[in-house]
Amino acid sequence: VDPFAEREYWQIIWDNFQKGDRDAFQAIYDEFVDALFSYGSRITSHRALLEDAIQDVFIDIYSYGPVLRKPESLEYYLFKTLKNIIYRKLKEKHRFTHPEEMMEHFDLTFPLEEIEEEISDEQLKQLQTELNKLDSKKRELLFLKFNSGLTYREMGKLLNLNPEAVKKQVYRLLTNLRGKMGNGTLNLFLFSMKN
C-alpha cells in the first residue's frame, strides 16, 4: 500500500468525521484500536490502565474532534495521544516524575510462533537476549519501524529524537542484530514483527 495514498485516505476520513460522519469515526476506531493496543501493551503491562487509556483516546477524539486541527498523520497523532495518556495515568498511579522512568521496560517480545519452526531454540533465545540488551528507546524504535506507518520524522517526534538520528539508529540496530544473528534469523524475526 502506498503510504502517501493511505495518509491521504485517512485525512479524508478525518475530514468526514469532523463534519459529523459517525461512520468515519467508527472507521478510525476499527482501523487503529488494535495497533494502539499493541503499542500500548509494550509501554505498560497494566491491561485495565491500557484499556482505559485507549478508551480515553477515542473519547477525546469524539469529544474534541470537530475543533481539533487535522493531523498530518492520524497514526502518529493516535500513538502520541495514547502515550501521553498512559504517562499521565502511570504518573497518577505510581507517582513517577519523568516519562523515562515509566519507559524503562518497553516490551519487545513478540509471539514468535511464525518463526519458531524455522529457527532453533538456541537462535530464538539468542534473539531474545539481544533484544533484551537494547534500551527502552531502541526497543520502541524497532517496534515503531516495523509495526507502524510512521515516517522517521514522526518516530523522532514520538521519541524526542531528530529524524536523522532515528534513521541512523535503525540502521545501526539492524546492522548490529544482523551481525550477531545472521541474515536469515533476522529476516524471519522482522517478518514476524510485521504480521
What is the role of each PLM region?
Residues L141-K145:
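A short pre-motif secondary-structure segment
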Residues Q18-K19, D56-S73, E92-K93:
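Sigma70-family region 2
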Residues P66-K70, K80-E100:
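Arg/Lys-rich amphipathic alpha helix in sigma70-family domain 2
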Residues F96-S120:
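Internal acidic/polar
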Residues K83, Y87, R153, K157-N183:
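DNA-recognition helix of helix-turn-helix
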Residues V1-D34, N195:
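N-terminal module of bacterial RNA polymerase sigma factors
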Residues D2-A5, N16, L174-N195:
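C-terminal edge and immediately downstream basic/flexible tail or linker adjoining helix-turn-helix-like DNA-binding
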Residues S38, D52-I59, E72-N84:
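Structural recognition of an alpha-helix C-terminal capping motif at a helix-to-coil junction
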